[in-house]
Amino acid sequence: MTVAKRIIPCLDVDGGRVVKGVKFVDIRDAGDPVEIARRYDAMGADEITFLDITASHERRDTMVQVVEKVASQVFIPLTVGGGIREVADIRRMLNAGADKVGINTAAVARPEFVAEAAERFGSQCIVVAVDAKQVSRADEPARWEVFTHGGRKATGLDAVEWAGRMAELGAGEILLTSMDRDGTQAGFDLALTRAVSDAVPVPVIASGGVGTLSDLADGVLEGGADAVLAASIFHFGRYTVAEAKRLMAERGITVRITGDERTDV
């Protein structure tokens, strides 16, 4: 049985509002997270990912409240990332209604945290976010480095090797973002996506750079991704999830079709 590929709208949340920037800067407001999540649920999105891009301790309660409100009205899986640093953070988000949590900086600081989290809560709800930037020259074999803190801090870690290590430690999925492509609408970094997809035994979610519906299909067919994540093309009404799934199905990709997806919302 072929597993359906997933379309996952991503909501970057700052101070309780959805925003979307270009290369993680130049942020603009895209609306209320609860209303947007409800819309995506009705449109047939397979999952929703929330990324708390500020994630300060002072504003943590705001994100918990957002998750609680969304979980009470939306009935597809929710992943929450940003500021997940310890077991208590994971428990708090899961108790608020999240189905999965995304771990990024804390995994780099203390890789064993991923193993502890997977053992405590199960690999199925642990997503390790890998933000990667190409560091090789044009005349060299492609090489990508892991960055943290919203792409501001280099780690010296090889992104492909790091993704493999995270899977070994218990990550159930890898959320792979190309920092070079994020917000550019130039398409996924397919070489990066393929390299990581080939290197890990767990699902890879491709992120960063979607500008057209064809980019989503390319992420699966050329990049080998199990799921594709996008923000701007959906947030600002350029395309609907239903249109994305129709295009992917036309290109031979198995997707989940529900009654709601047959009519655009």
From Swiss-Prot:
Pathway this chain belongs to: Amino-acid biosynthesis; L-histidine biosynthesis; L-histidine from 5-phospho-alpha-D-ribose 1-diphosphate: step 5/9
EC number: 4.3.2.10
Pfam families registered for this protein in UniProt: His_biosynth (PF00977)
Protein known as: Imidazole glycerol phosphate synthase subunit HisF
Keyword annotations: Amino-acid biosynthesis, Cytoplasm, Histidine biosynthesis, Lyase
Family per similarity comment: Belongs to the HisA/HisF family.
Source organism of the structure: Alkalilimnicola ehrlichii (strain ATCC BAA-1101 / DSM 17681 / MLHE-1)
Record-level Gene Ontology MF annotations: imidazoleglycerol-phosphate synthase activity; lyase activity
Highest classification ranks of the organism: Bacteria, Pseudomonadati, Pseudomonadota, Gammaproteobacteria, Chromatiales
Function: IGPS catalyzes the conversion of PRFAR and glutamine to IGP, AICAR and glutamate. The HisF subunit catalyzes the cyclization activity that produces IGP and AICAR from PRFAR using the ammonia provided by the HisH subunit.
Source taxon at top rank: Bacteria
